[in-house]
Amino acid sequence: MEIRRRPPNPTVRVENLEYAVPHREAQAKNILEEIVWHKDIEIKNFKKIVSLEDLIKKIENLPAPKDFYKNILESKIKPGVIAEIKKASPSKGVIRKDFNPKDIAICYEGLGASCISVLTDKRFFQGSYEILETVRKSTNLPLLCKDFIISAYQIYKARVSGADAILLIAAILSDDDLIYLKKIADNLKMSVLVEVHNDNELERILKLKSFNLIGINNRDLKTFKTDLKTSIELMNVYADIFSKQNILPISESGINCAKDLESLRSIGIKGVLIGETFMRESDIEESFNKLFYSI
């Protein structure tokens, strides 16, 4: 699935200077492309408020990032849990009306989550970097900044806001982009979870030989439907490679019940990223216990 970058000039001038119409190539072809295109605008707006240089200065006084990989590897719960804080999504709208990031973070840590993922995209997921900052103050767990990262600026902003790890999505980044952004994260001692959706993307990532956390997203980017077959089919082919290269495979999305969890555990999945299953329930603790302790 090809995700194009936003055209530099999304309109075509018509007759007088004050008239313009959208160019046909300036229309996003799917929701993921729309999100990525909006990131260009969002990043420019962020830079007007805080420069990259100012972010770098702030990082100098921060404590070292927490070890995301180690927390999943040494988790008492198997597979390790990356519990997500997410208010809304493009496909479901508002998922959790009673949304208190501080209370959710404290709850997750008390239940034994290995790490916490925080949505920071505002327009499509109603997240923010302010939420990430709130969660940082509320828990000692490693935090993943869950965003659609296309720029080094976002990585520095995530670090300043309290993130220990970032998400890179193979579908929206070239190999050169992936290598460059990974180097930025490495320089900041941050962990990187790289996300794939199919075998072509996974092959790309393995050839780069740069990542030890690979997330297999079970969500179809065209339909936004989830199917655990994505994780199962890829693990059937690549489990041995992951093991030999000390790569932790993480299954993301569509994990709804204890049976799903057992299926993933049995094929060698080392971590699971779960958000909506917890967010849609009024009692997160009950939902968590039902998922991990009912077998």
Curated annotation (Swiss-Prot):
Has the keyword Amino-acid biosynthesis been applied to this entry? yes
EC numbers? 4.1.1.48
State the pathway, as annotated in the record: Amino-acid biosynthesis; L-tryptophan biosynthesis; L-tryptophan from chorismate: step 4/5
Identify a single GO molecular function assigned to this protein. phosphoribosylanthranilate isomerase activity
Instruction: Note the superkingdom of the native organism.
Output: Bacteria
Class in the EC hierarchy, top level: lyase
UniProt keywords, alphabetically: Amino-acid biosynthesis, Aromatic amino acid biosynthesis, Decarboxylase, Lyase, Tryptophan biosynthesis
Its GO biological process annotations read:
L-tryptophan biosynthetic process
* Membrane spanning stretches: none
Nucleus among keywords = no
InterPro entries, A to Z: Aldolase_TIM (IPR013785), Indole-3-glycerol_P_synth (IPR045186), Indole-3-glycerol_P_synth_dom (IPR013798), Indole-3-GlycerolPSynthase_CS (IPR001468), RibuloseP-bd_barrel (IPR011060)
Identify the HAMAP family for this entry: IGPS_B (MF_00134_B)
Q: Please report which protein family the annotation says this sequence is part of.
A: Belongs to the TrpC family.
What protein does this entry describe? Indole-3-glycerol phosphate synthase
